[in-house]
């Protein structure tokens, strides 16, 4: 274990978080907020600067990062950023509990959008902005963001980025990894700006459009108001948000093909076609199922398309009370919670590509039992998928199911009903946000459950393994 490089890079990342807090500080100045808010932000910046400078005083002799160090850096960074990112809420007295603040910012950085707040009105503009700003930074990945702006290009960035970017296969769009991070972030931020401008043109205030765009771009779903998108009573805004979140659930590497004018490669992608097919089929089924509630096709389509888009992308914006929908529609949405968006997107969940691979493995196993002598291979985008990747997906599925079941078991100790407990486990681990049931706030859970769900959100965002390393004694050994 190269502990010195872990300490050095974590310290650098804490300095970056301190710098990011300048943004909500500016928002506090714009809205003339009270001294307590300024003190809370500046106090947190001071703590981060102290720890960051202390950790970078002694440079490591060996800059090489191996797989274990890469995964450990990623896990520690997300936990520490969530903890320190929550301190302004605690110091300002707007979320007095440290555990609640950790939960809220874990939800922010992991782009989950789950909240312990029953009323967003308790937050000042600056801290409301800070928790949504976490969506924007966490959407493409905290470490991808850091890699895009850091000058250091030593060995090992591949291990760090591979540990953070979701999906079974990690690929670079260009030869240099730093350039890959920069290209992805330029595409991401450009789409975010376009999204925010369109929302503003649709009638939102500048502040609301930025907050909503950050929630949509990061597929997190934090909103300005308690009733989320329903607050605006605008079909135009509803459809802009629906399509916008759907586009952020697409693999960002595919957008690079568009920049290269390789449109054919974009539309030939098998995961993309499956992703849109799932959206279309799910929307159609729900329209048929809820038509009796709304009694017209326009409203049935609007609500169905919006909820399918916001759930499969794991955004979690709200428009209507889906608990009043028939059980069949709720079941479809629960299934979409588990599937999630595309690999390489800002969306969470199991990922469409993994679901495709599992389905194809199941098909091949069925065919093998019928035709024992037939040689079967698994193809994705016209290429044979190697056995190692297939096995890694199956192993991930096993761990994924085990963690979901464990979460449901632990959360059931709070004596909530089964639908709430199951959706809480699925919602936090898949980084979705909303609860299915009688409550849409996680304040109903005990502090221990909220702490566990905070770590579950990070585990889900990092796809389990990096966070698990933190709790293995062997991780901290010198060998």
Over which residues does each language-model region extend?
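Membrane-proximal intracellular helices of multi-pass ion channels
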Residues: 1-479
């Amino acid at each position: 274990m190269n502990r010195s490089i872990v300490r050095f890079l974590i310290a650098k990342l804490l300095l970056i978080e301190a710098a990011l807090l300048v943004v909500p500080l500016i928002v506090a100045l714009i809205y003339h907020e009270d001294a307590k808010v300024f003190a809370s932000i500046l106090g947190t910046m001071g703590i981060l600067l102290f720890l960051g400078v202390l950790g970078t005083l002694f440079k490591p002799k060996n800059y090489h990062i191996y797989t274990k160090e890469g995964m450990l850096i990623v896990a520690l960074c997300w936990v520490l950023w969530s903890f320190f990112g929550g301190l302004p809420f605690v110091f300002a007295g707007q979320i007095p509990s440290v555990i609640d603040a950790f939960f809220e910012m874990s939800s922010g950085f992991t782009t989950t959008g789950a909240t312990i707040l029953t009323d967003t009105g308790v937050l000042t503009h600056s801290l409301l902005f800070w928790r949504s700003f976490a969506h924007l930074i966490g959407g493409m990945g905290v470490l991808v963001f850091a890699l895009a702006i850091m000058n250091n290009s030593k060995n090992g960035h591949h291990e760090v980025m591979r540990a953070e970017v979701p999906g079974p296969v990690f690929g670079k769009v260009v030869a240099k990894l730093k350039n890959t991070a920069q290209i992805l972030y330029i595409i991401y931020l450009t789409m975010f700006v376009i999204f925010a401008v369109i929302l503003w043109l649709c009638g939102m205030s500048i502040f609301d459009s930025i907050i909503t765009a950050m929630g949509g771009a990061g597929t997190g779903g934090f909103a300005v108001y308690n009733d989320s998108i329903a607050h605006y009573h605008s079909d135009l805004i509803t459809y802009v948000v629906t399509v916008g979140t759907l586009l952020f659930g697409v693999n960002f590497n595919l957008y690079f093909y568009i920049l290269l004018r390789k449109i054919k490669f974009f539309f030939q992608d098998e995961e993309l076609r499956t992703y849109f097919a799932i959206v279309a089929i799910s929307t159609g089924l729900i329209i048929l199922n809820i038509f009796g509630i709304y009694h017209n096709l326009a409203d049935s389509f609007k609500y169905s398309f919006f909820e399918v888009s916001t759930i499969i992308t794991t955004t979690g914006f709200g428009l209507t009370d889906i608990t009043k929908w028939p059980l069949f529609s709720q079941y479809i949405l629960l299934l979409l919670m588990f599937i999630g968006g595309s690999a390489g997107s800002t969306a969470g969940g199991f990922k469409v590509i993994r679901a495709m691979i599992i389905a194809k493995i199941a098909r091949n196993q069925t065919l093998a039992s019928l035709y024992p002598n037939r040689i079967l291979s698994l193809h994705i985008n016209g290429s044979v998928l190697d056995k190692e990747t297939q096995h890694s997906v199956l192993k991930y599925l096993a761990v994924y199911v085990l963690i979901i079941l464990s979460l449901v078991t632990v959360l059931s100790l709070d004596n909530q009903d089964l639908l709430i407990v199951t959706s809480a486990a699925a919602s936090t681990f898949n980084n979705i946000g909303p609860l299915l049931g009688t409550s849409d706030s996680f304040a109903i859970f005990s502090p221990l459950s909220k702490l566990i769900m905070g770590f579950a959100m990070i585990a889900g965002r990092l796809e389990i393994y990096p966070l698990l390393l933190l709790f293995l004694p062997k991780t901290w050994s010198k060998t």
